[in-house]
Amino acid sequence: MEKKVIAMAENYGISNYIVYSSFCHASMGLVKKLDKNAKTGLLSTNILDAIENQEQYHADALYPCNVGMAINRETVQYLKERNIPVRVWNGQEPLFGQVRPLGKCDLERYTLLGATDLFTNVPENYLE
C-alpha cells in the first residue's frame, strides 16, 4: 500500500506537500525506506509510545492524542533539542459528519507540555 500511495503522490506532483501519518508506526518506517525525503508523523494515543518509535522509524513529527500527553519537563526538552514537532489532536472531537458536542481542548496546557501544533477536524472551534 505504501508504494502505491507514494507513487500516487508523485503522479499528482504533490509529494512535497504531504506529511504521511499513521497509527501503524512500522508503515511510516516503510514510507521513509521507500522515499527518504518523505515527511512522516506517528499518530498515537500516548506520547511516550510515539517517542519510543520516533528514532526507530525516523519520523519527522509526533501526533499524540491530547489525553495521552502525560509527559515531563525532560521529555519536552528532548523533543525541543531534536526539533521534533508535537502535533496534538483532540481525541474528543467528532469525526466528519458526526454531530455531538466537543469537549474543550486546553491548548495552553498542551503548549506547556510540549505541543507545538494542534490539528483538528473543527478549526472554527479554536478561533477566538
Residue locations for each model-derived region?
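Short loop-to-alpha-helix "cap/lid" segments that border enzyme active sites
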Residues: M1-E128
